[in-house]
Amino acid sequence: MQGSIDSHIEGIVQNILEDSVGTKGEGVYLVAMTVKGSAVHRKIEVILDADSGVRIDQCSFFARRIRERLEEDEALSGTMGEDFDLVVGSPGLGEPLVLRRQYGRHVGRLLRVWYRDTEGVEHEVAGHLQAVSLTEGGGSITLKPQTAKKKGRQEETEDMTLELDAVSRAVPEAEI
């Protein structure tokens, strides 16, 4: 039953996002959604993003729309309970990138990436994201790896290109 509730709520969220064309919510997409708790008290977390980033006013815009639809939905009335928490936000710094589409807005930023080489050995690299190439079946990213500074100057490194299929995790990091 929980799985069908999750997919029903996700369908509602997707419909709201699709209906937002031409409004302040245009261009926003669903990254992740979780539903926790029992029928007595549920917590719904919705993580949204956009190619240019999501603003706070967009999160509140969608929170209102989602809450209205959930409260009006007769299919959920018996299974949701009257008391539920709804949290709508955007991915924070340090949160892993979940969708390929998210890489584009991090060009120029520091990224820590875990990837597997051709032998299947996992490696970790931190560097500035230089480019993103998304294709129908995959894509790649180009990083300029960070190196340790030696006596006041930073050593030059060559850019490295990684196929997105080889990337197991990528996390934007703060620059210090």
From Swiss-Prot:
| Keywords from the named record | Cytoplasm, Ribosome biogenesis
- What species does this protein belong to? Chlorobium luteolum (strain DSM 273 / BCRC 81028 / 2530) (Pelodictyon luteolum)
UniProt family annotation = Belongs to the RimP family.
Instruction: Tell me where the signal peptide lies.
Output: none
Return the protein name: Ribosome maturation factor RimP
Region: Disordered; residue ranges are: 143-176
Q: Which InterPro entries match?
A: Ribosome_maturation_RimP, RimP_N, RimP_N_sf
Gene Ontology biological process terms, A to Z = ribosomal small subunit assembly; translation
Q: Which residues cross the membrane?
A: none
Any single Gene Ontology cellular-component annotation: cytosol
Q: What does this protein do?
A: Required for maturation of 30S ribosomal subunits.
